[in-house]
Amino acid sequence: MEIGKNVKRYDVLREHGGILKVTRGDVTTEYVSEFCGASHSRTQKNLFVDRSIKDKLDDILLCGIPKNTDYPKPSKWNAYYALVTTNSQPVSMPNIVVIDDFEKLVTETVDVVKLTGTGEQKEYQVLSPTEKEIPILPFDGAGLVTPECASRWAEELDCRSKRTGRRYIPSCFQFRCLPAVKGEAFTFDLKQFAREKGVSKIVDLGGREWDIFTDQIDMIVTKSQFKFWNLYLDNVGLFDCQKWKSAFEEEVHGYRRTFNVAKYADAPEDIRNTSLLSYQPLQTVRFTPEEAEQLVSDSVSTYERIKSSVDEFLKYCGVSEEAEYIKPYYQALQYNHALANDTYVRGKMQDDIKRMKNELLSGKQRIHGHYEVFCPDIYGLAEFAFGLEVKGLLPNPWTIYSKYWTERGVSEVDVIRNPHIAMEHRVCQVITSAEMQKWYKYQECTIVSSMYDTLAFALSGADYDGDTVCTTDNVQIINSVKRVMESGNGNLIVKDGESGKELKSVIISDVPGLMEVNARGYKNNIGSVIDRVTDLWTLSELYPECRKYIKIGTIVGAETIDFAKTGENASFPVEVLKFLKDKKKGYWMRYLEKNLAAAQNESLSMSNAEYFGGDPDKKKRFVDYDCNMNRLCHLAEQKIAEIDKQTEVVAGEEFDYRTLLSGNVHVNRDVYRKVQILQDEYKKLADGIRASYKSKDKNEKANISLRYRMFYEKCRAELLYIVPDIDKLLDMLILIYYTKRDFRDNQKSKDLLWNAFPEEMIARAKSENINKQVDFKKLSVKHHKNNLAESKKKRTGKITIASIDRSDCADNEVIFYKEDREEIRKLILKHKIVKRSDNQVKYERLIAVLLYLSRKMNMQTLTLRNNCPGELSYQNIAMLADVNNDFIKPALKSLKECGAINIETMQSGDLKIDVLYYGKPFGEVWFCTENYNQAGVKIRDYFRMDKAA
C-alpha cells in the first residue's frame, strides 16, 4: 500500500488494528500491516499480508523469538524484520560462528556540530575544527566465508561472467538469514590462514570456543551482522548460538528456513572502465579553468562519438557489454544498421542522445572509473577471529588495495560514495605486496580499505555490508579534492551530543504501535535534504555562511538515514530554511531530469505572465550564479552546440520497411480495428503514468515497467487470438505501422509493435525465420481474462479530478438554478466577447463549468494545472465543457478582461483562478449534483448550437 505524505488514511487503519479490507466482486479479504523496512519507509509504503496467514508467517519469520517480546527500538525492529522482503536465492547452509565486533580509535581533525534539544527544539551549532579520537568498527557489516563454501554457492547460483560466460567464485556475497542476519561475506581462505598462523580456535560472541577444522566452520559472522543477537541469550545473559541454530533448523508449518544470497560481486571481466559521475560529487569541489576544460572535453568527446557512429551508440547503450536489459529495437539495430534511418528507431536514438546531452549539461561527467563493493581489511578480521593481534595488511591510513587499479599501474585514486552531501571524497594511495596478492587473492572486484583511518565514516557513513564506492584516477578530480582537503574544508563532520528524547519500546506483535513508528518515518526524506544541500553548494561562493549550513545538512542527512536506528525525525533548522526561502536554483539544474518539466514551466509561466499581464522576470526559477556547476554547464553548452552544428545524428544506409516482411499478405480488417483500439488504450495508459509519476524511486520504476509489460502481453495475446499464424500477423502489423496513415507518421505508435513482439522483430531484422508455434488453448484463456478485466474497468466518458476528489469538498452538492443559465448567457452577450454563435456556446459552457467547480470548492481558488490528466487541468476543463484544448487559454484571457474571473500565474506555469462572477443562486432549480461529470453532461446538453442566441 502506498501511503504518500498524507497519512490520514493510514492513521485510520492504525486505529482499526492495521486491518485493510479489500473487496473483489463478492469476496472481501482482510489484510494486516506486516512489513515496513527502510526502503518502504523512504518511499512511504507499507506491505500488508492476508490476515489469515499472518500468525503462521510470524511463526516462521520470528525464528523462536516470543511474540510478546518488548523491543526497545521499534524503528530498528521494523527495518530489520522487513529484510525478508528483499529478493534472494537459497544456497546451502554454512556452518557459522558468530563473533564480537572489533572496535578501535583513530585520531583525526574533525568539524564538530553540537546538537542540543529534541524534536522541533533541536538546535545545531557548528564548532571550530578540533583533533578528536574517533571510535570506529573496522569490520562493520562484514564477515568471512571459506573458498570451499564460496565455490559451492557459486555453483548453486550459477555465477558466470556476463561477458564471457566463464564460471567464477565471487569476491563476496550479500546474504540474508532469519531472523535479521544480514551483511557481506567476503571470500577468504580461513583454513590456510589458520594453518600458517598455527591457530584453530575461535571464541564466539557468547564465549564458547569452536575449532575451524573439527567443527568444519565455513563462515564467520560478526555481531554487527546479527541484528537480533541479544534475543538469543542463555540464563546468564550471554549469546547462545545453539539456541538460535535449533530454532532456525526447526520445521514450522511445513516450512524449512534457508540461508539466502541477495547479490554477489561481478566477475572481473565485467567491470566497466567508465562511469557516469553524478553532479553531487562535482559540486563539492572547485575546478581551475584548465581542469574544467579538460573534464568537460573528455565527456563531450564521448557524446560526439555516440552521435556520429551506430557502433559507438550501441556500445553506449550496453548492447556489446551484455547489459541486463537492452531495448529490442537497439538489439535489432546491432544486426541491421539501416534501422538507424527508420523514423521510429531514429526517434528513440535522438531521445537517448538528448538524454545524454542533458546529463552532460546538468554537470554529470563520464569518467575513467567504476563502482566496486567496499571491503574492510579482511586479513585483520581473520586475525581478530582467531584472537591474534589485529594489524591487517594495509599498514597506513588512506591506503587501499585494488586488483583493478594495480593491474593498470595506477597509484592514486579518488574514492567517492553517494549519497554525497558534504565532501564524500577521499584521495587514497593504491598499494600492493606479495602478501596482499596472496591473502586478497579472491578480492578481484572489491576496494579493500585500511583500518587506520576514517574512510568509511568520510564516505557518508559507509559500512561493509554491500555498500559500493566509486574509484577514479581522473587527475582533475583528484587535484581538486586535494586542494579542498588542504584548505581545511574537507574535514570529517561529526555530531557531538545525542537527542534527549526517550524512545518508547513496543511489543513486537503490537501492529498499531509499530504502525505509529512507520508514520513517523514517512515524514523523513533524504532526497529533500540532499536537494537543499545542493542549493547551498550552488550559493556557497556567494554566501560564506553556506559552509556552516552544509555541515549542519550533513548531520541532518545522517540523522534522516539513521531513523531505523534512532526512531527520531530530523529536519533543517529554521535558520537554514529562512536563508533558502527566496533563493532560486542554479541555472545548471534546469537540465536535471527531475527539473526538465520545471524548466518548461518557467518558460510557460513567463509567457503566461506576459500574456495575462505581469512581470515575466519574477517567474524565473533558475539563476546563473557564479558556481562550479554553472561553469561546467556553460562549457558543456558551448562544446555541444558546436558538435550539434557540425554533426547530424548518425545515419546508416537507407531503410526500407519491406526488408522486415516475410511474405505478401493483406491486412485483416479485424486486426486493423484491434490495433486502433489497443493504440487508444496505450495512449491512456501512458498519459496516466506520466501524470502520476512522482519520483525516480526504483520500486516505482519497476511498478511502471510491470504495468507496461502486462499491457504488451495483453496486446500480444489479443492480436494472436485473431491471427494465430505469427508470421502472417507480424507482416500485417508491419504493413499497418509503416503504410497506414493513422500510424506511419506517429513516432510513438510502434512501441506496441516492438514491445509486444520483441523477439520476432529482432529475428526479422536479422532476416531469420521465426518458426514459432502458438498454443491456442492458452491464448483463449488469456483472451477470456482480458475481456473480463476490460468489462470491469469500463467507465466511458468520465474524468477524474484528484484534487477535488481528495478534498473536504468532495461530497459538496452544487445547486444550479435556471436563472444561472440566463445570467451566463447575458454575461457573454453583454461584454461582446464573441461574434460567432459556436464560440458563444463554448464560452457559455466554460464559464458554467468554472462556476460549478468554484461553488463545489466553496468559492476557493481553483488551481489549473498544465498537462496533468489526473488533476484540474486544461484537458479536464475542455472535456467537461466539450471544447478544444487550444480554446481554453485565450478564452480564459477574455473572461479575465470582462471581469468574470481573476488569474494569477504561478512559478510552475499553473494558473490560480478565482471566479468573480457568482451568478444568482435563487429561483427554480436546474440541477443539483455532487458529481462534476454529471454536471458536465447537464451543461453540455443545455448550452448547444441550436439554443445559441
Predicted region positions:
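Beta-strand-enriched accessory nucleic-acid recognition/scaffold domains that flank the catalytic cores
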Residues: 1-461, 468, 474-849, 864, ...
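Winged helix-turn-helix DNA-binding recognition segment
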Residues: 789, 858-916
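Short, cationic-aromatic polyanion-contact patches
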Residues: 906-938
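Short amphipathic alpha-helical elements of helix-turn-helix/winged-helix folds
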Residues: 848-856
